[in-house]
């Protein structure tokens, strides 16, 4: 899905959040892994703000981005894909 690739390249958490919500409206929810790649990179690095903008994927302490696989101690939505944010290796 190129849609998630374009979302993950956005560094502004607010802009990223809006894009992710728009993508949900077009029915592109694939799995928690692919969504984590899209939201974790752009919206997951903003601490508390990022946790909220991650649309529930980073609510388990993952403030550094789910795509990086280093979001926290108990985040079940982590993709564990290494530092692949913005790249094609998010499993989409």
Swiss-Prot record:
BP GO terms, sorted:
sorocarp development
Q: Which InterPro entries match?
A: HssA/B-like_chaperone, HssA/B-related
Q: List the disulfide bonds.
A: none
Q: Identify the stretch annotated as signal peptide in this record.
A: none
Enumerate the PANTHER family for this protein: HSSA/B-LIKE PROTEIN 1-RELATED-RELATED, HSSA_B-LIKE PROTEIN 1-RELATED
Which protein family is named in the record? Belongs to the hssA/B family.
Q: What is this protein called?
A: HssA/B-like protein 46
Q: Organism, per UniProt?
A: Dictyostelium discoideum (Social amoeba)
